[in-house]
């Protein structure tokens, strides 16, 4: 019996200004779905896996084909419903309604665990959508680069006087998310040693210039790091190995990095983390044949790695969980103080979230990099005083290789997102851009996620696990007229640990799009300010007042 999730075909998004669907509002999700499976974008495109363990774009290849066929014929008053990667219905709505509504991986809380999900997955009844895999707005490793860069820069401010020159970062994982780390470190002025067990992933990052060098030798990696830091150079190296082996070995040797973190796919103990002593081939085979054995061995190995991270933390080295739930896995394995070191959001990112600042992104449906160059220039023009953002855009232009359709990530917040969206739409309307632009974001944003071990860890009022907020975010984006809206469970940290929502909106140059863009790109980040104001953060309360938000139970207006 053939595997419905495996196909050797190569998928690439159409380019140019010729429509394959009835309008740009259906052409946009069509192209972005296909872009998610571009071999230059996805981790394992032949298996529909985009990133993050088993984060898929569609449930099966038949479902992919059905989604594509449906989008090509969808009318401007119809909405396609996608249930865990399967196109289950088309319904009459109206022209300002989303063209696609997506729900991925959602389970009733009592059953929201990997065992139950994997059982459903095996039967073909579910699909893990991660965050931007199943919501069709993954743009390659760039999608996390700026967030990682902002994190490292803030760590430098807090611990090293704002200067990471001559410093180095130890981390693990070079997958779809972790692959951003070495480049982000270098852009922040630091060196990076990234441990990766799968050499094909390291090679992918070398090819796309996200990492500078590769080695199989720990001694060589350390020698390179030592030489670079002494010379004040910012460079990165991938070490082929197992983080659960390398991290403790560095502790044993007394090696002291300047910052320690990890972005292995520890959120998925079957598909995301290589057990100690295993080969990658053995691991892949046993994922199918004996997943329970894999999970047990992986969890035990995670405990070993987290203990090493605790050893670094106890030695006074800034150490953070980068949102893969590895501390939780170690805690469940009996490591009682696994949460002694913080997650990256409460440590470095939350003040940005309080102002609705997060991973705003856009992609050029034309496929022409010049369209991104023009939008970069427009961002600088509209935000002339944000020198930090200008610096980011300059570095991104120089260092970031596009994967699939040209795209840009740019952290901006409430008050700026809608201005950029309207400006991009005007550029489409007057012909400055060769085709429409889509604007989206990661589900990791200020108002769109409940994740007590990551984005909502250690909330001021203790509301870490309250997931009303992402549900309200999805509902409001739907009511506001986003082109497609998604509601997922388990992204980033795994089953049972998160709920989150996404939106994408198309700038097709029309006046109708102006109205939708103004609503969506104001309301979406405003929910983040609202959520943090409700939790009692002064920055959010002040920003809500400044932006004129009407929050009756919070501001009394």
Curated annotation (Swiss-Prot):
InterPro entries: Urocanase, Urocanase-like, Urocanase_C, Urocanase_central_sf, Urocanase_CS, Urocanase_N, Urocanase_Rossmann-like, Urocanase_sf. Its cofactor is NAD(+). It catalyses: 4-imidazolone-5-propanoate = trans-urocanate + H2O. NAD(+) binds at residues 52-53, 130, 176-178, 196, 201, 242-243, 263-267, 273-274, 322, 492. GO terms for molecular function: urocanate hydratase activity. It is found in: Cytoplasm. The active site is at 410. Catalyzes the conversion of urocanate to 4-imidazolone-5-propionate. Belongs to the urocanase family. This is Urocanate hydratase. It comes from Brucella melitensis biotype 1 (strain ATCC 23456 / CCUG 17765 / NCTC 10094 / 16M).
């Amino acid at each position: 019996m053939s595997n419905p999730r495996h196909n050797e075909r190569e998928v690439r998004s159409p380019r140019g200004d010729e429509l394959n669907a009835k309008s740009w509002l259906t052409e946009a999700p069509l192209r972005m779905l296909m872009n998610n499976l571009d071999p230059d974008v996805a981790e394992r495109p032949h298996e529909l896996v985009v990133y993050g363990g088993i984060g898929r774009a569609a449930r099966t290849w038949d479902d992919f084909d059905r989604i594509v066929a449906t989008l090509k014929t969808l009318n401007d008053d119809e909405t396609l419903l996608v249930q865990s990667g399967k196109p289950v219905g088309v319904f009459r709505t109206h022209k300002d309604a989303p063209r696609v509504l997506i729900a991925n991986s959602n389970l009733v809380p009592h059953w929201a665990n990997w065992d139950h999900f994997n059982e459903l997955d095996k039967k073909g009844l579910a699909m893990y959508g991660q965050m931007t895999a199943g919501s069709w707005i993954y743009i390659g490793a760039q999608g996390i680069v700026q967030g990682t860069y902002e994190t490292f820069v803030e760590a430098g401010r807090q611990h090293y006087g704002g200067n990471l020159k001559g410093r180095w970062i130890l981390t693990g994982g070079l997958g779809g998310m972790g692959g951003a780390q070495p480049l982000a470190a270098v852009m922040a002025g630091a060196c990076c040693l990234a441990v990766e067990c799968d050499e094909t992933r390291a090679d992918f990052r070398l090819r796309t210039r996200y990492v500078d060098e590769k080695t199989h030798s720990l001694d060589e990696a350390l020698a390179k790091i030592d030489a670079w830091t002494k010379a004040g150079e910012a460079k990165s190296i991938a070490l082929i190995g197992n983080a659960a082996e390398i991290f403790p070995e560095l502790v044993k040797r007394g090696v002291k990095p300047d910052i320690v973190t990890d972005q292995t796919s520890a959120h998925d103990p079957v598909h995301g983390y290589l057990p100690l002593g295993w080969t990658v081939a053995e691991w892949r085979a046993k994922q199918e044949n004996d997943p329970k054995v894999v999970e047990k061995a992986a969890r035990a190995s995670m405990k070993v790695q987290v203990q090493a991270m605790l050893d670094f933390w106890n030695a006074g080295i800034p150490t953070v969980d980068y949102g893969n739930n590895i501390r939780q896995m170690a805690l469940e394995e009996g490591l009682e103080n696994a949460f002694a070191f913080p997650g990256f959001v409460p440590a470095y990112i939350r003040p940005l979230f309080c102002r609705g600042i997060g991973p705003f992104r856009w992609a050029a449906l034309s496929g022409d990099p010049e369209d991104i160059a023009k939008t970069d220039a427009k961002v600088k023009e509209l935000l002339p005083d944000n020198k930090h953002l200008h610096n980011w855009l300059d570095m991104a232009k120089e260092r970031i290789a596009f994967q699939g359709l040209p795209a840009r990530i740019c952290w901006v917040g409430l008050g700026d997102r809608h201005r950029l969206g309207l400006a991009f739409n005007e550029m489409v309307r007057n012909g400055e851009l060769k085709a429409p632009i889509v604007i989206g974001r990661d589900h990791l944003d200020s108002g769109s996620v409940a994740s007590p071990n990551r984005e909502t860890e250690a909330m001021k009022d203790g509301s870490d696990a309250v997931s009303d907020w992402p549900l309200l975010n999805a509902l409001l984006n739907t009511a506001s007229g986003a082109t497609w809206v998604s509601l997922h469970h388990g992204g980033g940290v795994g089953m049972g640990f998160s709920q989150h929502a996404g939106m994408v909106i198309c700038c097709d140059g029309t006046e109708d799009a102006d109205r939708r863009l103004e609503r969506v790109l104001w309301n979406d980040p405003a929910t983040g300010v609202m959520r943090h104001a409700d939790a009692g953060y002064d920055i959010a309360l002040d920003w809500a007042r400044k932006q004129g938000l009407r929050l009756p139970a919070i501001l009394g207006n």
